[in-house]
Amino acid sequence: MAIMPYIRQGTVINALVILFSFWAFLSLIRVIRRRSSTTPLKGPPSESFIFGLRQIIHKSEDSDALYEQWADKYGSVYQVSEPMGSKRVVLCDPKAILHLYSKDTFDFVQTEINRLFLGKYFGRGILWAEGESHRRQRKALTPAFSNVAIRNITPVFFDSAYKTKAAWDATFESNPTKERIIIEVQTWMNHISLDSIGIAGFSHDFGSIQGKPSAVLDVFDSFSNVQPDATTTLMFTLAATFPIMLNIPNNRNALFTKLHQTILEISDELLESTRKEEEGKAGGGRGDAKSIIGSLIKAESANSHLRISQEEVIAQMNVLLLAGYETTSVSLTWALIELSRHPDVQQKLRDELSRFAATDPTWEELTNGLPYLDAVVHEILRLHAPLDETIRVAANDDVIPLGTPLQTASGNIVDRISIGKGTTVSIPTRCMNRLTGLWGDNAKEFVPDRWLNDEKDLLKANEIQGYRHLLTFIDGPRTCLGKGFAIAEFKAVLSVLIRHYTFEFPDGPETKVVGHRSIMERPKVAGQDGAKVPLLVRRVE
């Protein structure tokens, strides 16, 4: 009898070996098929069969520069090694990028691991959806992000900025002998973004600017304090090949689970309260299409041809709350950093805004009447895009045209490449925004003036077909639905802060700023504990 456990153990081991061998065989067949259908491309040598070049990219202080170096050496389209011997095609050719984005959600879809991650932690909303499901959800949300809707909610952005001003002024008044005080600005930008998306999107004031406790803000802040350890990094590296590893407990997964639960509770509460309010109005339950939550309720109506399920409604709220908080706060923080580094630019912007001493710019003026504010904002979006790359998988065999002929690994010169079904293809979006070949020798520098003169100074960047020749909001069917919302908030808040305060680094403009891993990469002053950016702030007389 004592031998039975060993027999059972041996049986389990044999079964695992057989399963792994079967997986390896199927994977080999898929790899052979993909490679036989894909044009052989040049690329940097692999550092490891298990990790490919993932660790090199992950550990690099400037992965965008790494992608650019490889493009210079191997051509505007090349391949890099991925974990477990797989390959990824990298597109740095504008024509090829346009082709991929034009076929997004149908012929090029998200990776399996991305969809599993999004579905698990944020629900089956617009970020998760593909094809017709994505098209339907996007149409349902579009009214909430029209120009009319954004014009109506722009006062919310100004209100958040003035609440922050009131808090800062109170600090000055409690320190009457100090003309300048140190303020950790990133925390305040987080509060502005959270309160703005709460009020403008969901008619809910989180009150974070006034210091009101918020469960969702606590979770957001936790991501900045808990950095991924070696185990977590290994798990995410291999999860693309073994998606089941996404379920392994670790500190980051625990935070995403907590974030999901917290936002879910808030979304349920906000949705229920809005439904009750709408029931008392004429045509109860149909909502106000000018608000995000109103559009969601309208789309949930059984009579709507764009009907979305309650699960999808909650998922949209999860994604919009996260996106509205994270991306804008990062961009605002980077704006204050660059303006602190460049006091001449800061003063030029203040001079342009000086005519609004007694009133605020209208939405129309923010959009078209303040060219230098527009230039500063778009230079920040170019130089410091919140997302670093777009990764897709070919759902079918495809042929991608090239703007610049390319020499393949076999020595042939081609003006298009074949991509086999199942091939992973990526676009290094932040790298493209800074590519010297597109933006000139000063591509890595903060130069708002490049956006003036009808954008004639953009050189070859005009070949990029995305919004304002940037890939910050990507392009095609998945182009960021909330870009108008984000830009209006960015401009409104920045216009208030620059009119009333000056900003500089306590240790001078050469202060080193590094990346800090959070939900998205955030800036932080080197040496700070957490994603902190302390600046010396003075009131403008």
Curated annotation (Swiss-Prot):
Organism domain of life: Eukaryota
Alphabetical UniProt keywords: Heme, Iron, Membrane, Metal-binding, Monooxygenase, Oxidoreductase, Transmembrane, Transmembrane helix
Protein name listed in UniProt: Cytochrome P450 monooxygenase claW
Keyword Secreted: no
Main location as per UniProt: membrane
Binding positions (heme): 480
Role summary: Cytochrome P450 monooxygenase; part of the gene cluster that mediates the biosynthesis of clavilactone A, a meroterpenoid that features a unique benzo-fused ten-membered carbocyclic ring unit with an alpha,beta-epoxy-gamma-lactone moiety, forming an intriguing 10/5/3 tricyclic nested skeleton. Cytochrome P450 monooxygenases claO, claP, claQ, claU, and claW are close orthologs, suggesting that a redundant function or pseudogenes are present in the cla cluster. These monoxygenases are not involved in clavilactone A biosynthesis nor its modification.
EC number: 1.-.-.-
Localization: Membrane
Membrane-related topology note: Single-pass membrane protein
Cofactor(s) needed for function: heme
Family matches, as Pfam families: p450 (PF00067)
Similarity comment text for this entry: Belongs to the cytochrome P450 family.
Single GO molecular function: oxidoreductase activity, acting on paired donors, with incorporation or reduction of molecular oxygen
Transmembrane segments: 12-32
Pathway in which this enzyme or protein is active: Secondary metabolite biosynthesis; terpenoid biosynthesis
One Gene Ontology cellular component: membrane
